[in-house]
Amino acid sequence: MIWHILGILVFVVIYNIWRYYHKDDSYEYCSDVQDTVDNNQGISNMEAISTRQLALNTIEKIGSEPQDTEEARIQFEYQGVIFLMEAVNDCAFVNLIWPWCHSFSKFDIDEFARVRQVVNDINLQDTVSVVYTIADSDDVALHIRKNFLFIPQIPHIEDYLKLMLNDFFRTARILELEIEKCRVQECEQHI
């Protein structure tokens, strides 16, 4: 037992002597990290732009014309589809919504069961949320929604926004295909 303690003490002494005579590179790394942090803070101070203004500028850069709605949302058209964006100045995240991406009659019970199953599956597996609402008319409307980070430090932010928008189109395709698969499976079961 005494040999174990002596061995540990000898190791500690040798390590401290080695550290004393050799330059420790970890301190240089710390100064490099501090310089990087200082540079990033300088960049963020230069790019102090509100989230809403960043959203408006980015929407214009992807070739769409942003418009303000009565609910303080940003409405724009991208590839023939109207989107709504909720961007608040004191928040680094935005909500993007594709309203009325799919609709059906609220009296069609079979369709409602199919859509409910598909919506639940999509919400479990995807990065977007699909929600349904009952409108004043006899329709049930499906909306696709996504909440994501939107800050000036994101490189190629126009491509980033296009990528987020493409998630909506992919989800809408999946939604239509899965609903159709459910219809076909029901028809096969009745035959």
Tell me what each language-model feature is.
Residues 3-89:
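Charge-rich, low-complexity N-terminal segments
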Residues 48-52, 108, 112-115, 161:
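Generic alpha-helical secondary structure
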Residues 71-73, 90-93, 137-143:
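A generic structural signal for beta-strand entry/edge sites
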Residues 79-113:
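Long, continuous compositionally biased terminal/linker segments
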Residues 99-147:
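Short, internal acidic amphipathic alpha-helical interface segments
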Residues 149-164:
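A short acidic/glycine-rich loop-to-helix N-cap element
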Residues 160-176:
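Short, well-ordered, aromatic-rich surface patches in folded extracellular/luminal domains
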Residues 178-191:
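Short, highly charged C-terminal tails/helix-capping segments
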